[in-house]
């Protein structure tokens, strides 16, 4: 079924939105859309131009052959206001993910999900939007998964000067089964959180 350029742009936008902060590679887009790379390049130029011309808060970015949607820099002051929320407003699941990242960083989403035993994409997006976590690099290997780490905002929100102020993990933490490991992270992190309240 042939689609015109407007429909292609809408489909690309939907795909990039669904992909979140991991974005999609050129290869992934070409495969999903079943088009040639040259055609994709033209579509992406149209999408990027539309975001630049329109009065929108997001833009199309390209990094290492990966496309993603991101917030325009001029709106950063408003995002900073948004993330200035009390840490007590975080859910138990969010605290658990923060605990895992703070002890294991840099860490991929897949590794976090292995430890927790449940999907964590939505929580990660929320924590990134609050500037408590950020992308600190890309993992080696297929897919070049995003590596997550904590931010200065994380330290500030939890009353820490450095990550070294987190309570040490027991020596046998690495030998525990994954669920026990997640429980241990959360217990230690929650204790730190209680100490600084």
Curated annotation (Swiss-Prot):
- Record SUPFAM superfamilies: Winged helix' DNA-binding domain
**GO BP, one example?**
cell division
One family name in Pfam for this protein:
SMC_ScpB
Task: Give the signal peptide, or none.
Answer: none
Question: Cross-referenced InterPro entries, in alphabetical order?
Answer: ScpB_csome_segregation, WH-like_DNA-bd_sf, WH_DNA-bd_sf
The primary site where this protein sits is cytoplasm
Q: Which GO terms describe its cellular component?
A: cytoplasm
Which UniProt keywords are present, listed alphabetically? Cell cycle, Cell division, Chromosome partition, Cytoplasm
Q: Does the keyword Cytoplasm apply?
A: yes
Subunit annotation: Homodimer. Homodimerization may be required to stabilize the binding of ScpA to the Smc head domains. Component of a cohesin-like complex composed of ScpA, ScpB and the Smc homodimer, in which ScpA and ScpB bind to the head domain of Smc. The presence of the three proteins is required for the association of the complex with DNA.
Please explain the role this protein plays, according to its UniProt record. Answer: Participates in chromosomal partition during cell division. May act via the formation of a condensin-like complex containing Smc and ScpA that pull DNA away from mid-cell into both cell halves.
Recorded family membership: Belongs to the ScpB family.
Q: What is this protein called?
A: Segregation and condensation protein B
**Per the UniProt entry, what species is this protein from, by scientific name?**
Bacillus velezensis (strain DSM 23117 / BGSC 10A6 / LMG 26770 / FZB42)
């Amino acid at each position: 079924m042939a689609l015109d350029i407007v429909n292609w742009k809408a489909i690309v936008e939907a795909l990039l939105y669904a992909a979140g902060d991991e974005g999609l590679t050129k290869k992934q887009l070409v495969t999903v859309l079943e088009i040639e790379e040259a055609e994709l390049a033209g579509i992406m130029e149209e999408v990027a131009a539309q975001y630049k011309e329109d009065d929108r808060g997001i833009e199309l970015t390209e990094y290492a052959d990966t496309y993603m949607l991101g917030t325009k820099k001029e709106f950063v002051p408003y995002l900073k206001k948004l993330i200035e929320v009390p840490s007590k407003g975080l859910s138990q699941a969010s605290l658990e993910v923060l605990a895992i990242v703070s002890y294991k960083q840099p860490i991929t989403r897949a590794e976090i999900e292995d430890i927790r035993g449940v999907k964590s994409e939505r929580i990660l997006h929320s924590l990134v939007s609050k500037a408590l976590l950020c992308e600190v690099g890309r993992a080696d290997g297929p897919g070049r998964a995003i590596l997550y780490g904590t931010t200065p905002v994380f330290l500030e929100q939890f009353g820490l000067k450095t990550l070294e102020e987190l309570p040490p993990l027991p020596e046998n933490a690495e030998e525990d089964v994954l669920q026990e490991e997640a429980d241990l992270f959360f217990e230690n992190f929650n204790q730190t959180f209680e100490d600084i309240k």
